[in-house]
From Swiss-Prot:
One of its GO terms (cellular component) is cytosolic small ribosomal subunit. Binds as a heterodimer with protein bS6 to the central domain of the 16S rRNA, where it helps stabilize the platform of the 30S subunit. Belongs to the bacterial ribosomal protein bS18 family. Keywords: Ribonucleoprotein, Ribosomal protein, RNA-binding, rRNA-binding. Gene3D superfamilies: Ribosomal protein S18 (4.10.640.10). GO terms for molecular function: small ribosomal subunit rRNA binding; structural constituent of ribosome. InterPro entries: Ribosomal_bS18 (IPR001648), Ribosomal_bS18_sf (IPR036870). This is Small ribosomal subunit protein bS18. GO terms for biological process: translation. Part of the 30S ribosomal subunit. Forms a tight heterodimer with protein bS6. The keyword RNA-binding applies.
Length: 74
């Protein structure tokens, strides 16, 4: 069996040297949510731990302010 070589993903926030993740930046937050409304895990989106925590709190804050849906209806 051939082994697949996994490429390390680079945190997009670190690459752009962004210090904080804002809940107001909806276009960027929507990239990290599935079509069902769930937050993508770190191993899939490639964020570092620091920015994944900030991203999670920003998404949850945007949901509370009704900027993002909790779930997507069919």
């Amino acid at each position: 069996m051939a082994r697949r070589r996994r490429r390390n993903k680079v945190c997009s926030f670190c690459a752009e040297k962004t210090t904080t993740v804002s809940y107001k930046d909806l276009d960027r937050l929507k990239k990290y949510i599935t079509e069902r409304g769930k937050i993508l895990p770190r191993r899939i989106n490639g964020n570092c731990a620091k920015h994944q925590r900030q991203l999670t709190t920003a998404i949850k804050k945007a949901r509370q302010l009704a900027l993002l849906p909790y779930t997507v209806e069919n």
